[in-house]
A protein has these predicted regions:
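Alpha/beta catalytic cores of nucleotide-metabolism and tRNA/nucleoside-modifying enzymes
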Residues: 1-120, 125, 130-131, 138, ...
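Glycine-rich, positively charged N-terminal anion/phosphate-binding segment
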Residues: 94-113, 124-193, 392
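Active-site beta-loop-alpha junctions enriched in small/polar residues
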Residues: 124-126, 149-151, 179-181, 205-207, ...
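Conserved radical SAM core fold
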Residues: 139, 149-155, 182-183, 204-218, ...
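Non-cysteine beta-strand/loop elements that form the S-adenosyl-L-methionine
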Residues: 146, 199-207, 265-276, 326-333
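Short glycine-enriched, charge-decorated loop/helix-capping segments at active-site entrances
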Residues: 161-163, 215-221, 280, 342-345
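Active-site beta->alpha loop and helix N-cap motifs at the rims of alpha/beta catalytic domains
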Residues: 171-242, 247-255, 264, 392
Length: 447
């Protein structure tokens, strides 16, 4: 076939073909976009958009925190006004001698200045807020700790400081507890509060998974040089005393004693010792004998923590350890009247619930979940008998809602009074909820 007889075919250039395909695809996509989405599809799309927006927000927040940096945190702390003592006072000299006899004497002088407290409310996340601290003082607590404060957030974010640090003139003596693993950041955070509390505490005792992830609490204990540097930075840079809360180290007690002595000589003025290791959490007997050995080795006040369930346990703990104070946590959450010597009872818990709500009305917690968490513990035995009221309490959104539930609990208890079990039934208490087999105290320790 000659060239003159070839069919008259015009080839489409590649670019033109691609453009044509793209136009076809775009037309199809436009048609798809124009088609109305089903209700379920719209919900899926909205959910995806919401999740994406949240991811972007968190990403922006992380970037902002990185940009602030440690130096900016220090600058913000030093520039803080509004009555906060953020400057380094003349006696807050990092180069001064922090250990030795002079420090030991100053630690005891501080202890006497705050009244030599024997009954201490522990720092508890979302639980030792102002309303509950005031309630504990009402029943006899002589020293209270704030909930744990995250040093990085506290140093950098004004909103976090406002929401989580709630001092009051009547709430003294008060210790503000911080967690963290950076000396400069811890100091920056603590300088925001030093004018509004009596001491600053370093959390070296939290055994929870979140502390492992955040590298703080009891997960710092194996890093002796680090924890000593944290205490030294605080003691050398603040105008108020520095305290610390630790757990026992695994193995020989000499390891714990050695660490305690190092913290004392780094500037720690009061040491709280919990009588279990990080791994044990609350699952075994508290070793009061080990706490006693730490107390005997130190030259500063020591507070014992762990194993207190009943009022009589406080006396036993102090006698067994020789410590200067007893710190209460879980038992006080269920029965803050323990500070005044009252045992847990169904009848008493109704009155305690009302007393807490009165305090919460005067000093509202930052969220209703905090308020409800307290009532679930205080009313644990009654709510275990009246399950429907648990759901009603869970739906409460404010003090008035919660008070209505307390009224309903009281009415239900009265109606069931004839069939009620003994008020002192240990198996029914919140304290015993996770202690397998109801482990009972033995010599030298307590559950």
């Amino acid at each position: 076939m000659s060239a003159s007889t070839l069919p008259d075919v015009v080839a489409t250039p590649p670019t033109a073909a691609a453009d044509a395909d793209a136009a076809t695809t775009a037309t199809a996509a436009s048609a798809a976009d124009a088609a109305p989405l089903s209700k379920s599809a719209r919900k899926r799309q909205q959910k995806l958009e919401t999740l994406e927006a949240r991811k972007e927000k968190k990403k922006a927040e992380r970037k902002k925190r990185r940009e602030l940096g440690k130096q900016k945190a220090l600058e913000e702390a030093e520039a803080e006004e509004e009555g906060e003592d953020t400057s380094s006072p003349p006696d807050a000299d990092p180069a001064r001698e922090l250990g030795g006899p002079a420090h030991h004497a100053a630690a005891w002088a501080f202890w006497r200045r705050i009244g030599q407290p024997r009954l201490v409310l522990a720092p508890m996340v979302n639980q030792s807020e102002l309303a509950f601290r005031m309630l504990a003082r009402q029943y006899g607590a002589e020293l209270c700790y704030t909930p744990m404060l995250h040093s990085t957030l506290f140093a950098q974010e004004e909103v976090y400081r406002r929401d989580n640090f709630d001092p009051h003139a009547a709430d003294r003596p008060l210790v503000a507890q911080f967690c963290g693993d950076d000396p400069a950041t811890l100091l920056a955070a603590a300088r925001h509060v030093q004018g509004r509390c009596d001491a600053v505490d370093l959390n070296l005792g939290c055994p929870q998974a979140i502390a492992r992830k955040g590298h703080y609490g009891a997960f710092l204990l194996p890093e002796r040089d680090l924890v000593v540097s944290l205490v030294r930075a605080l003691a050398g840079g603040l105008s108020v005393p520095v305290t610390a809360k630790i757990r026992l180290l695994p193995g020989d007690i000499d390891e714990t004693i050695s660490l305690a002595l190092a913290l004392q000589e780094a500037g720690c003025s009061v040491l709280t010792v919990h009588g279990r290791t990080r791994e044990q959490k609350c699952s075994c007997l508290c070793d009061w004998a080990a706490i006693a050995k730490v107390k005997a080795a130190l030259s500063i006040p020591v507070i014992a923590n762990g194993g207190v369930e009943h009022p009589a346990d406080i006396r036993r703990l102090l006698a067994a350890t020789g410590c200067d104070g007893a710190m209460l946590s879980e038992a006080a959450l269920e029965n803050p009247a323990i500070f005044g010597g009252a045992p847990v009872s169904r009848a008493g818990q109704i009155g305690i619930a009302r007393a807490y709500l009165a305090r919460a009305r005067d000093h509202p917690p930052r969220s209703s979940s905090i308020l409800k968490a307290h009532l679930f513990k205080v009313l644990f035995m009654a709510l275990d008998r009246h399950r429907a009221l648990r759901e009603r309490l869970g739906a409460a959104s404010d003090v008035d809602d919660a008070l209505a539930v307390v009224d309903a609990v009281e009415a239900a208890e009265r109606a069931a009074e004839a069939d009620a079990a003994d008020d002192d039934g240990i198996g029914l208490t919140w304290y015993r909820r996770h202690r397998a087999g109801g482990a009972q105290p033995s010599e030298g320790g307590a559950a």
